[in-house]
Regions:
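Pre-Walker A adenine-sensing motif
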Residues: 1-8
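Hydrophobic anchor at the beta1->P-loop junction of P-loop NTPases
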Residues: 13
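P-loop (Walker A) phosphate-binding loop of NTP-binding proteins
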Residues: 16
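Walker A/P-loop
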Residues: 22
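Short glycine-rich substrate-engagement loop in P-loop NTPases that contacts/grips substrate
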Residues: 44-75
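Conserved Walker B catalytic segment
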Residues: 80, 85-119
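Short regulatory helix/loop adjacent to the ATP-binding pocket of P-loop NTPases
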Residues: 125-141, 157-158
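Interdomain hinge/linker elements that couple catalytic modules in large macromolecular machines
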Residues: 147-202
Length: 202
């Protein structure tokens, strides 16, 4: 993400549910920005899966809100939109017979603001690479997030390397496994994730 800053594109962070996309954007990257002089007020963050931001599922609401803050200012701003697949399509208020307005339309528009850098996350079947390239009309960078590699997994757990590898080989590299202390908890966690992905994302 650091390398893609201010390249004029929408940065689209994709990957399977719970693989760490939101953590990468709203924790790791946000902390990096704050440590490098960006003020908290310069980071506009929305979580479309939470009730507090539900009105911003409407692309026109989000666009108007962001423009009201960014356009009059000389400051540089970062826009984070988490879980873009929760966004709505809305009727075109200027042409009732026209195509509905989508989040892609709003973000393509906001991307043109010279003092705004746009980042979004998404995790379902609508966020495939070919769809991203089509919907953003070539104005996006896809940043693909995968589950942890064994090297990343071992750097977190430490200890006996062979034992860590056996755990990794059996349970995989989903980051949330690291916080589950027992085998039963790990299994239940993976079952719940499977059900969530199957029901919500496929």
């Amino acid at each position: 993400l650091v390398d893609y800053q201010w390249d004029g594109q929408v940065k689209v962070i994709t990957g399977i549910r719970r693989c760490g996309k939101s953590y990468l954007l709203r924790t790791l990257f946000k902390n990096y920005l704050l440590e490098h002089g960006v003020k908290k007020e310069q980071i506009l963050s929305f979580e479309l899966d939470l009730a507090k931001d539900i009105r911003f599922r409407n692309p026109l609401e989000l666009s108007a809100y962001v423009r009201e803050i960014v356009e009059p200012s000389a400051e540089q701003y970062y826009l984070f939109v988490d879980e873009i697949q929760m966004s709505d399509q809305v009727p075109n208020p200027y042409n009732v017979n026209g195509a509905p307005i989508t989040f892609y339309d709003a973000l393509n528009d906001l991307r043109s603001l010279p003092n705004l850098d746009v980042y979004v996350t998404g995790s379902n079947s609508k966020m495939l690479s070919k769809d991203i390239l089509t919907q953003f009309r070539g104005r996006s960078d896809e940043v693909r997030v995968h589950p942890l590699s064994f090297s990343e997994f071992y750097s977190a757990v430490g200890g006996d390397k062979q034992g860590a590898f056996e755990t990794y080989a059996f349970y995989g590299g989903m980051p949330l496994i690291l916080s589950r202390p027992s085998d039963m908890a790990k299994m239940n966690c993976l079952k719940a994730l499977f059900s969530e992905v199957f029901l919500k994302d496929i």
